[in-house]
Amino acid sequence: MKKQRRRPGSRRILRLTGRHWLLLGWTILLAINNDGAEITCPEECSCRTTFHREEGRLLRIACSRGDMHTIPVDYFDRNAQIISISAPAENPNFLTIGPIFTQPIPFVNLQELHIVNSNIPSIGQYSFWGLQNLRLINLTYNNLTSINADNFRGLINLTELHLDHNNIEQMPSETFRHLTALKTLVLSNNQISTLVPRLFRMLAKLSYLDLSDNPLADLNPEVFKDIQHLRVLKCRRCLLRRVNTQIYHLVPHLEELDLGENLFKYLTPDEFISLKKLKKLKLDGNQLSVIVDYMFGRNRELRALSLARNRLALLAPAALTNLSALVHLDIGHNKIDKFHLQTFAPIVDTLKTINFSGNNLPLNEIAIVLQILPDIHGVGMANLSLTDIPPNFFTYNEHLVALDISWNKLTKFPYKLLTKTKFLQRLDISHNKLQTLSEQDLQRLEAIAQIDLSKNTWHCDQCSAGTMIVYMTTTVLNATIRNLRCYAPMRLRGKSFADMSFDLLEACPSTREAQMSVIAGLMLLCVAVLAAVAGALCCSRRRAAHYYTDEEKRREHAHEHPDELLARAELGSVATIHAPFALAPKGS
């Protein structure tokens, strides 16, 4: 077989190609560096070009110094894709906006506009006219009191609008009718007391609506007729006492519902019957006293349920029936003191995290539940007044990854307990009464990724904290221990471990001091014995004094009445002589 001959000059062609690739690589690197270089822009701002994987090259202008009274748009590059105007909380801006981004030359490439903490009183009618590529507007932390449809004219491609943390009180019908592409609307933390009918007309694509922290008190079903494809609804802290269930019929695709921290006292058994696609439900922070049987019977796709911080004393035996997809359950900070085991039967195979914190539960009630939940990954047991946890408490939960035992009364680190949880990666043992950690405790902690040991009563003497200081400087526990603060002795209270060294620690009590303590104890014992002896002698003397006093009285009486004494003596003699005969039995 003949070998193919390489054509003349082919090696040179390959070498030239390699050189070209090298030159091309250098060119690309230089181009990237040039893209990230600073661009001429106003002194109070920074302008930089970045590269986004999906969007490509993006020119970002950011002004965050604060105390701005005008936006220097005349000095902005008109090709900017992102403009961000913000200010520190202590040094806010005082701005007004109008058609500054549209005239005389519009920012036609602008995709995101953030104007935050700038005391903007109003938006204006044509502030965004012609900005057809604008996708996100963020006007949070301003002083907006009202909005209307003309404020958003021309924003046909806007998908996100953030108006939270303002002072908006009212919005007319069809306020957002020009925002036909809008998917996310955040109106939380305003002063909205009423939602007028057809407020959300033309928002057929809206999937995320946040109305939290507004004094709504009630929700009108007519408001939700135009947003039937809503996926997330948040009405947290809205003073709601109930929700008209007709609303749930109008938003059947809802996947997340947050009604936390309202004023609900009860829920009807068919409350959420229409929300068959619901995956996350928050009812925490209300006034619910009971969860009745089959409350969530139609919510088979529910994965997360929060019932924390209510007034629940009991979960009905069938309260969780049909929740065969439930992964996260929070029943913390209620008044529960016992469980029905059948309550947890429907979720045995799926539940991964459960929070028992802040209830009146004894450990044995929790232990029984954990025995039937072998695949549990996260457990909350905070604020249960625990002084100790048995070493075999998590014997059936070998897959435990996260454990919260904060806000208890633990005085010793639960080393033996944690040796049973080999996969533990997150541990919160803060706000207890731990004073020290031994070397074996620290070795166990080295294997845990996230640890919170703060707010314990750490003793900063060489015996208690010496080993901890050594571990702070030589192991991965550096950051964890550095953040701790001394509780005792008083002269070191509040001092950070980061500022401590072994030499600064209080000296351990010496052997001589220990001996002196023993001697002092013996001396106190001797004093107590002497006091007892002295008391006994005092009592004896008092008795003797009484005896001699009585004898003297008898003698004085005999001296004054000799005849009586003589008669007693004769009577005694007669009794002595005749007594044997008197005691003799009959017939003797």
List the model feature ranges, each with a label.
Residues 2-7, 11-588:
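Extracellular leucine-rich repeat
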